[in-house]
């Protein structure tokens, strides 16, 4: 069992976003930062060196973007949560984004194996004029092998706050078996995705652009409190939801910051 910790602090120095503090214990690790979009947007890749999460693991991450910094954080590969040994695996993430800073939190998908027990909690605290774009893509069962999530449990809690006020609170819970098959659960789908943007005002034209995609899976798009956008997906194709979320990200980049998104090179192996 692992008790992994990661601490990251981003600081602006000479108009560049730099990692000023990094502390990591196994199995968590951070690759050398990249700057494919210029010195004030730091691309950061987090690795899980053990290959997957097991029952009893507790992984904690604390990430702080100081004022006027910008970062994109992703993961080196898909996350895996293995069948439980009877204990709950936990992932706890706290993110603080100071005034005029921005974070794009774009991890690769997480695969929840049949029989896994997993709880994750993500809290984001935003400063004034700061922005957040984050997504979560979760596959239940190794469906490529015909495996379904027939036993186990999954909990996912998201919280996004600004100045002590909640902007987005999302509590999700799924038991293996009937909840996978039922319409109020996954409706016999294998995969769900959530994308949340909080930042500048989102108008109707932008929402229509985001909706203007033809998907085999089910999709939903709406605005949120705090000048935000919410996208939901339920279906079976990792490639489809990744492509849609990437296109939404690119639209938001163009509309909100007048620049094109550059795909992290670690994604090129997808």
Place the predicted regions along the sequence by residue.
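A structural signal for small-residue-enriched, beta-sheet-centric alpha/beta enzyme cores
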Residues: 138-270
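A short, polar/proline- and glycine-enriched secondary-structure boundary/capping micro-motif
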Residues: 29-32, 82-88, 115-117, 143-147, ...
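N-terminal, charged/glycine-rich beta-strand/loop interface patches
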Residues: 1-109, 114
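N-terminal intrinsically disordered, cationic/polar leader segments
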Residues: 1-5, 9-25, 41, 90, ...
